[in-house]
C-alpha cells in the first residue's frame, strides 16, 4: 500500500474546500459586516464535512442561509490544495 495516500475522510475534506473555492462568488450586498469575508459559496455539500470546515475556521456558516463564507485561511488552504493537485485557478 502507498503510504502517501490520504484517507477518504481527508480527501472529502480537502476536495470539498476546493470545490467551495472554485464555485465561489462575491456577495453583491454592499453592507458587509466588519471583517466579513467577501467570497461566498453554496452549501450543497456533505453536512458533516461542512461542519468540520467550519470548526477549523476555513468557512463561516450562518445557519439559515443557503450559502456560506470562505475565510481568508480557507481561501489560502484551497489555493494550496489546487497547487498540489496541479489545478489552475480561475484568475491564472
Predicted features, each with a name:
Residues 66-71:
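Minor-groove-contacting beta-hairpin "wing" of winged helix-turn-helix DNA-binding domains
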Residues 73-92:
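Short, amphipathic alpha-helical interaction segments positioned at domain boundaries
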Residues 19, 51, 79:
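A cross-family signal for key residues in well-ordered alpha-helices
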Residues 1-29:
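Short alpha-helical segments that sit at the start of domains
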Residues 54-65:
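A short, conserved structural fragment
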Residues 23-44:
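Short acidic, hydrophobic short linear motifs in intrinsically disordered regions
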Residues 38-56:
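Short amphipathic alpha-helical interaction segments
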Amino acid at each position: 500500500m502507498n503510504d502517501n495516500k490520504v484517507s477518504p475522510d481527508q480527501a472529502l475534506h480537502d476536495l470539498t474546500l476546493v470545490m467551495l473555492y472554485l464555485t465561489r462568488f462575491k456577495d453583491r450586498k454592499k453592507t458587509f459586516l466588519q471583517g466579513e469575508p467577501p467570497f461566498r459559496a453554496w452549501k450543497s455539500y456533505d453536512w458533516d464535512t461542512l461542519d468540520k470546515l467550519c470548526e477549523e475556521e476555513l468557512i463561516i456558516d450562518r445557519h439559515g442561509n443557503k450559502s456560506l463564507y470562505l475565510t481568508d485561511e480557507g481561501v489560502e488552504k484551497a489555493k494550496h490544495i489546487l497547487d498540489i493537485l496541479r489545478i489552475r485557478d480561475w484568475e491564472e
